[in-house]
């Protein structure tokens, strides 16, 4: 998918927005707090039904308003819209003007991937951040995984309640059996997804981090000891669970470790190299989504200049030209964008007369096109 037109109403600090985007490359330049990240957040919200910046949906509405709308039209005139009324709590999902009940219906048409300065939490934020990254990708590749995950969490809550309240053995055994069954199902789907993701990674590492590409390994930890089945692991940890008051093993405890020569990746790479690895991993996930879901993702990169020197940005420009999807990039200064602007490989291939990119200035929530980026060449 490529977004041709983005419209927002009452979203964050943005003025009412209606902008036309380039099918390949778009730049938004502005100071911190100008609204650049809010624009990315609007697109992310449409693709996932939640924010990458806050868990509180009320923070997404403009000051002193109680509703907001995000909608797009793609290059084939497909229209997608998502609105939220904070007073009633109603979320309205529309596809070509028709109401739909589930976000998974939107996910079949739009896939959004993002890299932000906060993405470093993938390395330093603990297992929760790595789980979040994997789940955001699975949401688009395995549309029924969200339903499966909701059912698993329902059973997890019941089993934890049994532990905390020391319920009778029959009730506890029932929920434990169901918990093990669902854990194994979730782990199998997740393992397959991660295997497919890892298979896409080396190609992008060769472009972005060629010196370490053959040294990187990815380790999937299912959430309980590899050499034991889950039921045995739970039985052996019964006293510990009683002391803690929750399930210490299961699919909710999975993790993914990124290693270089068997050492934690973050201990071996500079911040700039870590960002390039994050980008390679995101590109791998984007290509996997496109291959399986047959929907080209929209890639959002917030603050492109942070951590990346000129050589890294040139490598990134090369990778983006190969990725073949719509890219939306924010930056504080126009100068950091020069490698991307200079790279003629991002030119629109359909006509040499079309512009190679669109550029916008963002100031106080207002978005204005830069004249020379929208002229016909």
UniProtKB/Swiss-Prot annotation:
One MF annotation (Gene Ontology) recorded for this entry: ATP binding
GO cellular component: cytoplasm
Name of the coding gene: recF
Acetylation as UniProt keyword: no
InterPro entries: DNA-binding_RecF, P-loop_NTPase, RecF/RecN/SMC_N, RecF_2
Source organism: Colwellia psychrerythraea (strain 34H / ATCC BAA-681) (Vibrio psychroerythus)
Name the UniProt record assigns to this protein: DNA replication and repair protein RecF
Subcellular location: Cytoplasm
Role description: The RecF protein is involved in DNA metabolism; it is required for DNA replication and normal SOS inducibility. RecF binds preferentially to single-stranded, linear DNA. It also seems to bind ATP.
């Amino acid at each position: 998918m490529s977004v041709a037109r983005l419209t927002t109403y009452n979203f964050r600090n943005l003025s009412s927005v209606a902008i036309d985007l380039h099918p390949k490359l778009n730049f938004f330049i502005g100071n911190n707090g100008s609204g650049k990240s809010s624009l990315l957040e609007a697109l992310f919200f449409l693709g996932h039904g939640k924010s990458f910046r806050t868990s509180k949906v009320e923070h997404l509405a403009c000051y002193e308003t109680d509703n907001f709308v995000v909608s797009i039209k793609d290059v084939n005139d497909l229209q997608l819209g998502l609105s939220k009324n904070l007073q009633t709590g109603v979320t309205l999902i529309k596809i070509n003007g028709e109401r739909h009940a589930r976000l998974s219906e939107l996910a079949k048409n739009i896939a959004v991937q993002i890299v932000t300065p906060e993405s470093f939490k993938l390395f330093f934020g603990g297992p929760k951040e790595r789980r979040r990254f994997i789940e955001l990708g699975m949401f688009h590749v395995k549309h029924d995984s969200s339903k499966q995950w909701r059912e698993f969490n329902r059973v997890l809550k019941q089993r934890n309640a049994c532990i905390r309240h020391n319920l009778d053995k029959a009730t506890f055994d029932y929920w434990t059996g169901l918990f093990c069954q669902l854990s194994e199902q979730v782990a199998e789907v997740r393992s397959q997804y991660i295997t497919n993701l890892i298979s896409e990674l080396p190609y992008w590492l060769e472009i972005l981090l060629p010196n370490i590409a053959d040294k990187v390994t990815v380790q999937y930890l299912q959430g309980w000891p590899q050499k034991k089945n889950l039921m045995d692991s739970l039985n052996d940890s019964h006293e510990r669970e009683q002391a803690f008051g929750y399930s210490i093993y299961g699919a909710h405890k999975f993790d993914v470790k990124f290693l270089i020569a068997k050492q934690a990746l973050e201990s071996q790479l500079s911040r700039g190299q870590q960002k390039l690895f994050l980008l390679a991993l995101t590109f791998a996930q984007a290509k996997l989504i496109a291959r399986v879901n047959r929907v080209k993702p929209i890639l959002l990169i917030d603050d492109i200049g942070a951590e990346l020197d000129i050589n890294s940005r040139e490598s990134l420009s090369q990778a983006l030209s190969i990725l073949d999807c719509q890219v939306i990039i924010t930056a504080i200064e126009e100068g950091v964008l020069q490698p991307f602007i200079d790279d003629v490989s991002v030119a629109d291939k359909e006509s040499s007369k079309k512009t190679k990119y669109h550029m916008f200035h963002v100031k106080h929530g207002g978005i204005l096109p830069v004249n020379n980026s929208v002229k016909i060449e």
